[in-house]
Amino acid sequence: MMKKTYTLAALLLSAVAGFAHADEAAQMKRGKELFLTAAVPACAVCHALKDAGAEGAIGPVLDELQPDAARVARALKDGIGAMPSFKATMSEADIAAVSLYVSKVSRAK
């Protein structure tokens, strides 16, 4: 009986991990889409980010800055320097997607 319980628990944990990975992949895809075109103005207009093929020259080069997701989210919500706030034009989910995308791809080596 105990072996069946452990097997069931392992299967459930595996399924949850699979769903989490699929959700992250969907968020990454949405984040890249927003970075390139959907945000107004698009992040790629100002920022350089190799994964996105973006060569903006106004804002920081994100591959060099390597911000974590919290830093990206804070900049999107509050604005920073010449960068405006996107709080009124982007949903929390979209801010989270861009934050995840930028933080993951800028830190990938």
Question: Residue locations for each model-derived region?
Answer:
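Extracytoplasmic copper-binding redox domains, predominantly the cupredoxin/blue-copper superfamily
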Residues: 8, 25, 30, 56, ...
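Electrostatic cytochrome c docking/interface patches
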Residues: 18-38, 71
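Gly/Gly-Pro-rich "capping" loops immediately C-terminal to redox-active cysteine motifs
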Residues: 35-36, 44-80, 88
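Cys/His-enriched microdomains
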Residues: 41
